[in-house]
Amino acid sequence: MTQYTPMIQQYLKVKADYQDAFLFFRLGDFYEMFFEDAVKAAHELEITLTSRDGGSSERIPMCGVPYHAAKNYIEQLVEKGYKVAVCEQVEDPKTAKGVVRREVVQLITPGTMMEGRTIDEKENNFLAALTHFEDGSYALACNDLTTGQNTVTLLTGSVEDILLEVYATGSKEIVVDSSFSKDELNKLTETLKMTISYEDATAIPEGLEHLVKNVSQAKLIKAVGRLFNYVIRTQKRSLDHLQPVEIYYTNQFMKIDVHSKRNLELTETLRTKEKTGSLLWLLDKTKTAMGGRMLKQWMERPLIQKERIEERLEMVETFVNDYFLREDLKEKLKEVYDLERLAGKVAFGNVNARDLLQLRRSLLQVPAILEAISLLDNAYASRLIQGADPCESLTELLGRSIQENPPLSIKDGDIIKDGYNDKLDQYRYVSKNGKTWIAELEKRERDITGIKSLKIGYNRIFGYYIEVTKANLAALPEGRYERKQTLANAERFITDELKEKETLILEAEEKIVQLEYDLFTALREEVKVFIPKLQHLAKVISELDVLQSFATVSEEEQFVKPVLTTKREIFIKDGRHPVVEKVLNGKLYVPNDCIMPENMDVFLITGPNMSGKSTYMRQLALVTVMSQIGCFVPATEAVLPVFDQIFTRIGAADDLISGQSTFMVEMLEAKNAIANASERSLILFDEIGRGTSTYDGMALAQAIIEHIHDQIGAKTLFSTHYHELTVLEESLDQLKNVHVSAIEENGKVVFLHKIQDGAADKSYGIHVAQLAELPDSLIARAKEVLAQLEGQEEIIIPKRVEVKVQEAAPEPVVVKEEIAEIQETKVETEEESQLSFFGGEQSSKKQDKPLLDQKETAVLAQIKKIDLLDMTPLEAMNELYRLQKKLKKG
């Protein structure tokens, strides 16, 4: 390092502590980067890469950005997942001896950004900290530095389960200890696309102990300690806005895994990953940024406590029934800025005068809001606003201190109102009225002394002076005038008052700017005292905003208040999919009932593709979620139980689990439901088994249905294209067949989108292919083959069988084959006739000659005697393996 100049040595010394970050090194009016940082930053920021002499034989790569534009460049890097260490000059270069002292004043990371385009006003910007314990459990702590919110929870389960909970927080950065395994880190970076940071300290930092008073578990404290230590180490400034840590447990809320949230499009759509088109988009009628954030949090964690849900519903009903109250509240909420993030900026020291003006304007609305809510005859409303302080003294302070239209910078002056500070008023008066004041002083001195020729003048060397001719010197009072200069015919004097005013006049502008800055920083410290009250007020305002949002959308979309029941029954009359209905924009939406009494657990849904099976299933889930966050629901009548979990398998394979086939994802999600669902859960399975061969898929689908029916008892909607499964209604007493109806008109299918009792009688798959505009020749051939398969033609479909058997294997093997139609020589009896794919009996056709030998006929007879509905999938495969071996022995 000694080969480099002292400044480059200083750079390298600082950089050694921030190897994983870009180092913005302040040099005069620029932030410079050197070596690898410069090469990489020039590429990422698309700025010029140059070089400079650093003392070594080779020139050093260098790039830089102006300090006044650095914020934009820092945001670009952080948006891409990088960290930026800001290194400032911490002493005046004019007085520095040697190299100017520099220090890193802040490490800016994806999880610690306070403002900028990466921060969505209606979303939290969480930083997560994950701590792993020897017993296999984890503690997850989260902090939103912009709002001061802190949460912590204890997690158990597989690493995948833990990662999914981390993902659910929406964190952009996660802090772990240095002992985390490479495999775990790979999952965090590759699967969750999060920035990784390290912190080994877990003790609660000094001065923050009061934030964990309600946390007693050592594991939780360690996670919070890791989080706080990282924040302190990186931010290096006041954290007065941090709120007490909130403990939550996943079993306190309805559990909806990440796959299900995506499938249901709760907060973003599957295709675009955007809010528009999601349930959140529909329900968000909030007027404040903090209300928008709370709405999303409620949607991420629906309630499971019946009493709490009903409290919200009653409050929403109050707003629905009082239009004028609701509209007045909305008008006032429009004027309320983001109190949480304003409080955070105050604590961080980066609040400006416009921010404080926004704070005052917000507080002006609060008394009327609280008064209106206090008049409601509602216990929940009374409890909600209890302890809410409108901070009227702060409103008054800001009202008399901050100008109505202050500049953005706090170092340009013109921030503080006249009358707030006497000294500032004097400076301003002097600055604006210096000459007038001098003329007034001159007149006053003439009156005091009686010397009419007395005058006040100014020159660059002596400044301001009072000049008296020598003939009038005797008229001057003794002791008041100090001689400053002697001329041939006159003497020049100075008085204490003139000396003071001279200083004021000459330095007024400079002193005005500095004094305003000092007054503003002092004011900022006074505002800090109100941070806890502001944060409490923000929560009250946020909750009222979400509740009025529910009321507004409920009235606009004609939703109905759901009735919660302790019974395991669902009664939804004329239910609708809220988002689909909204997107249709006035076009006819076909509502559907969903009526499942206590003794009915499973709906087996059949019907054509594109007929609305998936929409119907999602509809029930969304109605459930809306009910349990406290919103009215899209129906004319709704009676619902409180569900503890929702499990779904709807739609295409989820890309969160990379490298897995559709079928494997299906099985993993089915396993999740089977392993974790209770009789209080809701299960939605759409076309389970389609990712494998027909018989495999059918066998697995049947086994899953039977297991849910017999072992779990959860309310379940199970759609299938295996029409053979509809016979399960005969053996499973709590299963009911329903179908989505369709009709044919002039050879074309018309989907009615109506759920009706019973099984479907036709698939209409070819009609769907026609809608997709497949070639006419292909459609015609498909109709030919379908006719042959349904036995409507005498042409035999050529048998295509691929059998792979490991003869030495002692256990049964899975045989994958195409369906081969087996024709018999005799006319089949009614009992022997084969069922077609969707219900009708296969017509038997007498063949000209037999296709089976004696042994094959015997095996076929045994197959016909087998009762598949009385066998498990494993037993069925064993029997198939036995018969297969019998055939091959010939």
UniProtKB/Swiss-Prot annotation:
SUPFAM superfamilies, alphabetically?
DNA repair protein MutS, domain I, DNA repair protein MutS, domain II, DNA repair protein MutS, domain III, P-loop containing nucleoside triphosphate hydrolases
- Alphabetically ordered keywords of this record: ATP-binding, DNA damage, DNA repair, DNA-binding, Nucleotide-binding
| Gene Ontology CC terms | cytosol
Spell out the residue ranges making up region: Disordered: 832-851
Name any one Pfam family assigned in the record: MutS_III
Classification via Gene3D superfamilies? 1.10.1420.10, DNA repair protein MutS, domain I, MutS, connector domain, P-loop containing nucleotide triphosphate hydrolases
| Any one GO BP annotation for this protein | mismatch repair
Q: Which PROSITE patterns match?
A: DNA_MISMATCH_REPAIR_2
Residues the entry annotates as binding ATP? 607-614
Gene Ontology molecular function terms on file: ATP binding; ATP-dependent DNA damage sensor activity; damaged DNA binding; mismatched DNA binding
- Function as written in the Swiss-Prot or TrEMBL entry: This protein is involved in the repair of mismatches in DNA. It is possible that it carries out the mismatch recognition step. This protein has a weak ATPase activity.
Q: Give the NCBIfam families listed for this entry.
A: mutS1, PRK05399.1
Q: Which family does it belong to?
A: Belongs to the DNA mismatch repair MutS family.
Which named protein is this? DNA mismatch repair protein MutS
Which classification does the entry list for the species? Answer: Bacteria, Bacillati, Bacillota, Bacilli, Bacillales
